[in-house]
Amino acid sequence: MAAATEENMSVAALVMSVPDNIGRSPEVEGGGAAGEEKDAATKGTVAVGDSEEDGEDVFEVERILDMKCEGGKNLYKVRWKGYTSDDDTWEPEVHLEDCKEVLLEFRKKVAENKAKAVRKDIQKLSLNNDIFEADSDIDQQGDTKEDTSPRKKKKKIKYKEDKSPDDLRKKRAKMGKLKDKFKTELESTSEILGFDVKTKKRILEVKEELKDSKKPKKDEIKETKKTKRADIRDLKIKIREDVKDNRKTKKERYIDSPLESESPNDSFTLEDESEDFLSDNKEKQNVRTAKDKTGQDTVQESIFEKHLDDLISIEEAGTRVRRKKKQPRKFEEPKEIKKLENTNNFLERKMIPKKQRNQDKGRSNPELSKLPSPVFAQTMKSLRLSGEEKGLKSSDLAEEEKERKNEPKEKYQKRYDFDKEEKARKEPKGLKSFKEIRNAFDLFKKTAEEKNDLENNSKREEISLDYKITHDNKTKDKCSLREERNTRDETDTWAYIAAEGDQEVSDSVCQTDESSDGKQPILSLGMDLQLEWMKLEDFQKHLDGEDEPFITANRIPSNLLRDAVKNGDYIAVKVALNSNEEYNLDQEDSTGMTLVMLAAAGGQDDLLRLLITKGAKVNGRQKNGTTALIHAAEKNFLTTVAILLEAGAFVNVQQSNGETALMKACKRGNSDIVRLVIECGADCNILSKHQNSALYFAKQCNNVLVYELLKSHLETLSRVAEETIRDYFESRLALLEPVFPIACHRLCEGPDFSTDFNYMPPQNMPEGSGVLLFIFHANFLGKDVIARLCGPCSVQAVVLNDKFQLPVFLDSHFVYSFSPVAGPNKLFIRLTEAPFAKVKLLIGAYRVQLQ
């Protein structure tokens, strides 16, 4: 009878532990132990409804201190009347159904705190670890909280013993339904009380909680640590002793009274104890099943002991990690309380006879450990929580160590961390030493770590404070770019065109850089220029390459000079070119790339000016015919194109595929480069290898502005040429049609001009008609073109299909007789050499009629 009573009371303790597996009052925690002592004293005299526990044990809720969300459920921290802060427990909302007024009062206070926080100014969140303490215990806030909340009673739930295993199954099903119902109710309440992490209210709420919360004193922290360690040790010893005692009692129970091992129907009721025993055969079978059951129990007890040892070792490891911290986390205490509760529940689960698992005899031994026991599930959950807690502690330690290291550098890094980050994304313009590159990499790495710290400290926020700082830095960069454009407008006419037309190109050429002393971000024009103190005269000297010389005793080899030009290191190039060393500035690599081409392809305007002033040639050609101007036009560098054109770069040079700089600019759709090249005398009618003109590439890029610009320029050239012919012949010559499109040739690009064209003669040639070749001197003044059939240029020979053509007038070499044949024709013109002449020649042939 005594054994049966103990078994039934332990079953009742298991059922009572089911709804309290999340958070339990201190009286409920001690209920199981008190019940066992009572059973030992009464020895079977307890009847249903006659014991003292049949009365209602009343616990009054004094107030609700805090709320948190764990596992999708809202838990409330409850202060019980007559108990200290050490006895506070986390209770689900379901346990507070009789205390709705207290719950509503707590929610009202939360809403009032929100309203107060909205009125305050928004300040930056501190990057320390105090953010993690926002949802910690508020044990020290007793004087700030009001005690005016009404006191309600929480009744202890009384569980009656089941009459049969069928009733137990029904009760389990009901409990499962209740759990589902509780989950839905908790989800609905969490949706109502959930904070919007995408708004600034959450930030303000965290600040308010940070201000209201107080850190526990060091003495109290030490005392709580000592008590926790002592509790863990006592619990471990108690568990092992209970397991040993349980083994002994079971063995004695099955050896001394094997007939007392009843069937599963007899294990759950007190009334069935008076029934007759089974037959002798059934008794023998029960003895065998009892022995088998003891064997299974011993196996499971060993698994259980290992399970508990692992759990306690994890807790001890957690306490070791906690010793290293300066300030312990408050929110970790509820988790440790839960671990103690879970171990107690596990112990109660172990003390219960395994008769419930005999109900399903078809299950194997591993399946027995997977029974729908809420205690076992809660224990597994506590293991997961302890693992997560351990990870949190290790991450917190790393964060604290990093903060201690970064404290003296925070002020310096706050101003420049985002500038460094943006600078690292862009292609570096200057050749830096190894130490500078390493420092920049370290600083970039630190800024990335700081971003991770911000994300870890504000997990509930999606609004990042980094956005504001980066936005401010971007506005500063834009302002500095405007100042730089204004300076260049006053000094360089070509750069004025660049800043007026193409902002994107100027942004890529003139990037913001940071000074080496770290005081103020300054502009970088391919070198370390400090424009805040540089005057206009000094800047003009810099543009002309006449600024202060740099002298060094060390010789810089040619390969390092080439690397410096490629990387945009102005100082290194300046030092090398001002030294006594003689360099071949027109040196080429395996592809024919010169230093000027490298500077032009990289958009290094300062290096390009420096090389040009030192005598580098701008019209070098690679093996495929590419020039520095073609590189600059292809890379869309407007100011670089302007510098090269001013230095005398050839505009009509063709690559091996027949493309020119004008075609490259049309491909990129840059109307400013197209206008600049056209005004310098680019030929719009040159055909590529695939018989495509610049007008074709303008159509391909779908840029209407570029297409209209080319079309209007060609129409202007044709109109000016026809008007010049009529004025020259005084309307005695009628122009019928052009033989080939009008061409443009710059005399400085060479004395030879050649072109190919197809001619289709008309079927009926009227009398007095023929074909004449005209060579005009032209000047381009913006959109205006002035042409004349005279000038200093001397035409030496005109050859058409290997036949010399004769001039019409003996005293003029600008009008020639022209006899093309049907089909393809090849024209060659030899002019006098004038490498420095800026005159442009328009060449066209017309079928004319004498009047």
UniProtKB/Swiss-Prot annotation:
Modified residues (Phosphothreonine): 144, 379, 447
Ranges of Basic and acidic residues composition bias in the record: 159-169, 279-295, 329-364, 401-428
Site residues by UniProt (Interaction with histone H3K9me3): 59
PTM sites of type Phosphoserine: 51, 85, 136, 149, 164, 188, 263, 267, 274, 313, 386, 394
Any GO CC annotation of this UniProt entry: nucleosome
Region ranges (Histone H3K9me3 binding): 80-87
Ranges annotated as biased composition (Acidic residues): 269-278
SUPFAM superfamilies: Ankyrin repeat, Chromo domain-like
Keyword Iron-sulfur applies: no
The Chromo domain, residue ranges: 59-118
UniProt cross-references to Gene3D superfamilies, sorted A to Z: 2.40.50.40, Ankyrin repeat-containing domain (1.25.40.20)
Matching CDD domains: CD_MMP8 (cd18633)
UniProt modification remark: Phosphorylated in M (mitotic) phase. Phosphorylation by CDK1 promotes dissociation from chromatin.
A GO molecular function held by the record: histone H3K9me2/3 reader activity
The entry's keywords: ANK repeat, Chromosome, Nucleus, Phosphoprotein, Repeat, Transcription, Transcription regulation
ANK repeats: 591-620, 624-653, 657-686, 690-719
GO biological process: constitutive heterochromatin formation; negative regulation of gene expression via chromosomal CpG island methylation; negative regulation of gene expression, epigenetic; transposable element silencing by heterochromatin formation
Residue ranges of the region described as Disordered: 21-54, 133-174, 240-302, 315-428
Top-level taxon in the UniProt lineage: Eukaryota
InterPro entries: Ankyrin_rpt (IPR002110), Ankyrin_rpt-contain_sf (IPR036770), Chromo-like_dom_sf (IPR016197), Chromo/chromo_shadow_dom (IPR000953), Chromo_domain (IPR023780), Chromodomain_CS (IPR023779), Dendritic_Spine_Reg/Scaffold (IPR050889)
Domain topic, free-text comment: The chromo domain mediates interaction with methylated 'Lys-9' of histone H3 (H3K9me), with the highest affinity for the trimethylated form (H3K9me3).
Reported function: Heterochromatin component that specifically recognizes and binds methylated 'Lys-9' of histone H3 (H3K9me) and promotes recruitment of proteins that mediate epigenetic repression. Mediates recruitment of the HUSH complex to H3K9me3 sites: the HUSH complex is recruited to genomic loci rich in H3K9me3 and is required to maintain transcriptional silencing by promoting recruitment of SETDB1, a histone methyltransferase that mediates further deposition of H3K9me3, as well as MORC2.
Subunit and partners: Homodimer. Interacts (via chromo domain) with histone H3K9me3. Has the highest affinity for H3K9me3, and lesser affinity for H3K9me2 and H3K9me1. Component of the HUSH complex; at least composed of TASOR, PPHLN1 and MPHOSPH8. Interacts with DNMT3, EHMT1 and SETDB1. Interacts with MORC2; the interaction associateS MORC2 with the HUSH complex which recruits MORC2 to heterochromatic loci. Interacts with ZNF638; leading to recruitment of the HUSH complex to unintegrated retroviral DNA. Interacts with TASOR.
Name of the protein in question: M-phase phosphoprotein 8
Origin organism lineage: Eukaryota, Metazoa, Chordata, Craniata, Vertebrata
Gene this protein is translated from: Mphosph8
